[in-house]
Amino acid sequence: MTAPLSLGWPAPAKLNLFLHINARRHDGYHELQTLFQFVEHCDYLDFKVLDKPELKLHSNLAGVVADSDNLILKAAKSLQQHTKCQFGVEIWLDKRLPMGGGLGGGSSDAATTLVALNQLWETGLSATELCELGLKLGADVPVFINGFSAFAEGVGEKLQNVEPAEPWYLVLVPQVHVSTAEVFQDPELPRNTPKLSLESLMNSPWQNDCQSLVAKRHPQVAKTLGWLLEYAPSRMTGTGACVFGQFEQEQEAKDVLAKLPASIQGFVAKGANISPLMLRLAQC
């Protein structure tokens, strides 16, 4: 077994550079086309391998039971059960990404847990096998395990690696919770965007089909997006509430961040086509 204590495993945020909803399936899920890109802004997880099969989790968010916390333990347990691993783990989560918001933080934490423990427990699963486990935890988990910017189709499980530009982003976090389930159940959600080839999509204006609905239902999202659009091309990520503006230079994004009203939180981060998680795995 590898060294029992392993530090600094990143769980990066993702952005949906576009999100098109093509149809609603008979099972209630939605057919979609989307482009995922990572940003270099992450949660961090530390792992201590235990010689008995118990699972422990600590977080810097004292007293807060977040979806990401639950998914971390679910991920560890799923790998443990699938591989019949007799080791356990103690995990420390340094939560830096906003919870909810469309940045994929909970799914990313779960993916990092699967990737790290597969290495530390020496369970030997392939990336494909890890993705199959991850998909049972959440539709976005496989893209974080895959570790590369990706075009996704189906319900988000069919991935094709792509290399969009890697600009700087200013990501803003409206102080409102948007329910993904409510967005996808809303009768006013557009569900008829035509399916296009990847080549056509990469050369077309990008949009998020959820954006207008979420902005209508949540004025704080509309207000935040309107403010950011004064400075840069901007969209919502996922089902919100976070929005992002694109900049060529880091300083441009930081200059706009400095003007941000005190009531809105935000951060500047660079787009990354290779996940920081993959770079950490390569160090093992």
Curated annotation (Swiss-Prot):
Coiled-coil intervals, chain numbering: none
Pfam families in the record: GHMP_kinases_C (PF08544), GHMP_kinases_N (PF00288)
EC numbers: 2.7.1.148
The protein's enzyme class: transferase
GO function terms (MF aspect): 4-(cytidine 5'-diphospho)-2-C-methyl-D-erythritol kinase activity; ATP binding
Active site: 14, 140
Reaction equation(s) it catalyzes: 4-CDP-2-C-methyl-D-erythritol + ATP = 4-CDP-2-C-methyl-D-erythritol 2-phosphate + ADP + H(+)
Binding positions (ATP): 98-108
GO biological process, one term: terpenoid biosynthetic process
Protein keywords: ATP-binding, Isoprene biosynthesis, Kinase, Nucleotide-binding, Transferase
Pathway the protein contributes to: Isoprenoid biosynthesis; isopentenyl diphosphate biosynthesis via DXP pathway; isopentenyl diphosphate from 1-deoxy-D-xylulose 5-phosphate: step 3/6
Physiological role: Catalyzes the phosphorylation of the position 2 hydroxy group of 4-diphosphocytidyl-2C-methyl-D-erythritol.
Family annotation (HAMAP family): IspE
Family according to the record: Belongs to the GHMP kinase family. IspE subfamily.
Name the UniProt record assigns to this protein: 4-diphosphocytidyl-2-C-methyl-D-erythritol kinase
Primary gene name: ispE
